[in-house]
Regions:
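Short, well-ordered coil/turn elements that cap or connect secondary structure elements
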Residues: 12-14, 111, 153
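Hydrophobic anchor at the start of a short beta-strand
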Residues: 16-18, 115, 156-158
Length: 179
């Protein structure tokens, strides 16, 4: 749909802005990041001791949680990335109440300006609410009403990329991501 292309152009033309791609540790989004307790993090370090240093380089501590941008860890250890998926907040890994608390708390704490986010605020959260929590449109709208109440006083813009030909866009994406 052009999200990454647009992000690359914005990054090139606005170098003073901090760019957050999907998989980065973002102040508003946790897609492709693990969200672990300290105990879980220590267990992962023990299980994957050969890459524990890399884990540390891609991990931040927020309150009582360790957030790891695990897809940024390059390794040939079979199954590592799949193993780390279980610690994401998406894909139904946590109950909706906790999911909502984590996301809305991130929105509340977010006060920075000068950022550009890829796939944030809607894509991953809506997908999770539809596919994993099987929420109705009204329930999803209720979530976003709460989100809007939190975000309405903050200084940012939300861009929507309208796809004119959905079928050919899906075909292009399939070809690009064949692996």
């Amino acid at each position: 749909a052009g999200k990454s292309t647009l992000l690359n152009k914005l990054q090139k033309n606005m170098p003073e802005y901090k760019v957050y791609r999907e998989g980065d540790i973002s102040p508003v989004e946790l897609a492709w990041c693990s969200y672990m307790t300290s105990e879980q993090y220590e267990e992962v370090c023990i299980q994957y001791r050969d890459i524990c240093a890399d884990l540390g380089l891609h991990t931040v501590t927020e309150e009582d949680r360790k957030i790891t941008a695990y897809t940024q860890i390059l390794t040939d250890i079979l199954g590592f990335h799949k193993f780390m998926e279980q610690f994401e907040i998406y894909n139904g890994n946590i109950d909706f109440k906790q999911f909502k608390e984590v996301i809305l708390k991130r929105y509340e704490k977010f006060n920075e300006i000068g950022n550009v986010f890829e796939c944030s605020f809607f894509q991953n959260s809506i997908e999770c609410m539809i596919l994993y929590y099987q929420m109705s449109d009204d329930e999803i709208m209720d979530f976003y009403s709460k989100a809007f109440d939190i975000l309405k006083g903050k200084k940012f813009r939300l861009l929507y990329l309208k796809v004119m030909d959905i079928e050919s866009t899906i075909d292009t994406i399939k070809r690009e991501r064949i692996d």
